[in-house]
């Protein structure tokens, strides 16, 4: 059976996904055994596809800015898989920037 990652369907669910990214980084390996196929690939697939789902609500400019931050965050996590160089921390801080953008949209709607 193939693992199909959940795709966030709203701004609120995107905020939840960012919290998950912060907690599961930098390896995104499931320690519980419930999601053994979860990985950095599936985590960022979920986030990026969720951004596409919310594109109309976000607007093109915000959506692209969030995608750039997502790509930067992934690169930081990949460069520090053992959480020793500070890049993982920098990646986690990007989740806060993304949350600020998402919350600003949520307040307008």
Annotated model-derived regions:
Residues 1-40, 92-106:
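Short terminal alpha-helical segments
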Residues 20-69:
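Amphipathic alpha-helical interaction modules
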């Amino acid at each position: 059976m193939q693992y199909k990652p959940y795709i966030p369907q709203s701004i609120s669910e995107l905020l939840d996904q960012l919290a998950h990214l912060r907690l599961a980084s930098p390896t995104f390996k499931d320690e519980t055994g419930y999601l053994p196929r979860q990985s950095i690939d599936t985590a960022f697939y979920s986030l990026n596809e969720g951004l596409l789902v919310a594109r109309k609500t976000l607007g093109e400019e915000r959506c692209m800015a969030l995608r750039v931050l997502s790509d930067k965050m992934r690169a930081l996590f990949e460069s520090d898989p053992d959480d020793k160089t500070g890049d993982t921390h920098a990646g986690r801080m990007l989740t806060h920037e993304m949350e600020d953008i998402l919350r600003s949209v949520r307040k307008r709607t």
